[in-house]
Amino acid sequence: MVQKESQAALEERESERNANPAAASGASLEQSVAPAPGEDNPSGAGAAAVVGAAGGARRFLCGVVEGFYGRPWVMEQRKELFRRLQKWELNTYLYAPKDDYKHRMFWREMYSVEEAEQLMTLISAAREYEIEFIYAISPGLDITFSNPKEVSTLKRKLDQVSQFGCRSFALLFDDIDHNMCAADKEVFSSFAHAQVSITNEIYQYLGEPETFLFCPTEYCGTFCYPNVSQSPYLRTVGEKLLPGIEVLWTGPKVVSKEIPVESIEEVSKIIKRAPVIWDNIHANDYDQKRLFLGPYKGRSTELIPRLKGVLTNPNCEFEANYVAIHTLATWYKSNMNGVRKDVVMTDSEDSTVSIQIKLENEGSDEDIETDVLYSPQMALKLALTEWLQEFGVPHQYSSRQVAHSGAKTSVVDGTPLVAAPSLNATTVVTTVYQEPIMSQGAALSGEPSVLTKEEEKKQPDEEPMDMVVEKQEEAEHKNDNQILTEIVEAKMAEELRPMDTDKESMAESKSPEMSMQEDCIPDVAPMQTDEQTQKEQFVPGPNEKPLYTAEPVTLEDLQLLADLFYLPYEHGPKGAQMLREFQWLRANSSVVSVNCKGKDSEKIEEWRSRAAKFEEMCALVMGMFTRLSNCANRTILYDMYSYVWDIKSIMSMVKSFVQWLGCRSHSSAQFLIGDQEPWAFRGGLAGEFQRLLPIDGANDLFFQPPPLTPTSKVYTIRPYFPKDEASVYKICREMYDDGVGFPFQSQPDLIGDKLVGGLLSLSLDYCFVLEDEDGICGYALGTVDVTPFIKKCKISWIPFMQEKYTKPNGDKELSEAEKIMLSFHEEQEVLPETFLANFPSLIKMDIHKKVTDPSVAKSMMACLLSSLKANGSRGAFCEVRPDDKRILEFYSKLGCFEIAKMEGFPKDVVILGRSL
């Protein structure tokens, strides 16, 4: 089957060459203006731009490059990508996943029969959707350019791919060593000459295809030595590379905040052709904490007539790229004819572009330099509005039907490439397994896993991050809302697809858990009809728990999500506002401390008002997390859950810290004021919030992997109040275990009085509780300096306990309860000063056994330690019974370590410590 289709593909390619002799001979418009090798053409950039805009020239390549470091997308995701590209009027897909081993590391290996059929299916699907499929290969890691066998191996590999039906190719020499081996140095005068030589040879061997891309090793401004205009490497590329070959370029930097027109004119001049932009603005493979959901930005539509194309290299997570690709399409369509800005005339009154310009002029204060034809904020609104529809529809890639417009898509062995495993008895979803092109026999895990990215391979710019200037929320005019609604409705009406039938069924209040595909695993019961569902629907009684109904994701949720995960160099307006508010609350917290001298009621009111507003913003994040976790489209959820989980966790800590700042009695201004500005890169918005907490270096507490199965449950950590005492005592009593159960029911408060009573009474400033929907389920208590705390206990707490519990007779054998009572009447041992100098703070923590989420304990410990360090603590310790294995393990998982025995330590306890 493979050989038959390959022969047909070769015949088809030969007929295309005969029908287009100009393409076969390599003659093109670019060749007619590009200088001959070795000639100098100072006006080359302008000539390329003119030819690029002329009628009949090669089309502008605009689409997606799968070129990130990380697990490649699977075949069904790529087919879904083709559908979206066609829908949004984009035209190109470049296959270049760095971690597909046959693309880069083991580029010499040929594809197996199974892999070949998958590639043929993919190329055929791209053709059906009218998407140009460009196959890229990266031999630069270890190829010997002067070895004819190596060149023949590369030709044989690309010849195999061409037999699959591929017509467009790319040779990539990015992210490799500049040094040549000894054999190459004898043949080639420079690294650039070696690369250009093999690229030209491969290009001619393949029949000079219409689209052939070359990625230089100096692929951005910062990689050029000494600079772009004087780079010998780029000059060689411009002079020696055949004019029919296009050059990829990422802009001034690897991840370019902006790509100025002047920078493109500069590089076009030296490479003697307009480049194709490989855009990393939405790439997130260099930071495992970051996701980019902001709009395509920082690239004027004035670039379009000066380029041969733009290919965005987006997030590693496929479903997280809806906004990135959608806004790129909006950018491209705003000037897809390549019209120069100085000749742009007013569009017709009913055009989308005209309406967008009107809206931006009337209701926005966006930067003055905003493109006349393209508004990033409007493009983001349009993308999020359309993306919202996807969250209510379960994704089942393998069941999607494509409209045939030409060659038929092959099916491997008649089985879908991605199975749909059942996560539980009622929900059936498709788990997306991210793998390179592999044989069908490859083992697949049966459960969804949280995807992690490779360690940093590309270093973005080390420069400060700008925040988006917060826009004042103004009431939009009614006619503006109507116009926006009409735009979205018109777009949706024009772009109906097979999924829309599912949307209609969802609109009829059909539970998403009942949606099931025909190709699901056989032991799952078939889907019931609406009539059967109505007959068998359970109706709870008046005293029974009502049916659970999940709130749908809202447009406001997606806007908040985009603001929290915006772009590499800036946070969205809401994210920037939250960061500024937390920084202000932190720096001005001294005004609300109880012992603050010269209190200013106006400043106190301002602080509490802004704190309340900040807590409301944190609540919006929690609500967004809950609704997203319950959405019907589990495919989107799985791709983004780890990021949303991370921001939810850090915002929970930050909210608790702000609440603590507002109710403590001691001022910590000396520690909190005077930090540097919070502009940084690593970790995105969550990382910046972490750096503003006192224990920013406690990375183990901030590392909170999400659960294997997504959950929408949210816990609240807040400061302890006296009314919580009974609940904390109850947890303390229930979790205490001496091996035989609780033996003294007649004294229910005894354990609480012994373990937590003193801290709750005398150290309120450093006490937190954990809550869920049923009430308090955990506590974290501490005192910043145990020495004065013990003195206070001797004055007030111990006498009260001695009065409450009579000293038992020590002549007889004492029960466990009597031993505890006796401890109140005995002299307390004092820990050595040498130990307390490094670990001055005492902590006690416990969580009810019903709480199974391990991240909750880390968050509680982070809140407690933040409050202690904010008041100058260098370290904390806890005392644990040697036989209490559960609590020993509990503290160990929270970063506490056993302190070596020293003189003065109690003999009946183990002391664990943690440095701050």
Curated annotation (Swiss-Prot):
Modified residues (Phosphoserine): S364
Domain GH84: 60-336
A Gene Ontology cellular-component term: nucleus
Predominant localisation class: cytoplasm
Induction: Expression in the liver oscillates in a circadian manner with peak levels at CT8-CT12.
UniProt-annotated location(s): Cytoplasm; Nucleus
Effect listed in the UniProt record for changing C878S: No effect on O-GlcNAcase activity
Compositional bias annotation for Basic and acidic residues: 452-461
Protein name: Protein O-GlcNAcase
Organism, as annotated: Mus musculus (Mouse)
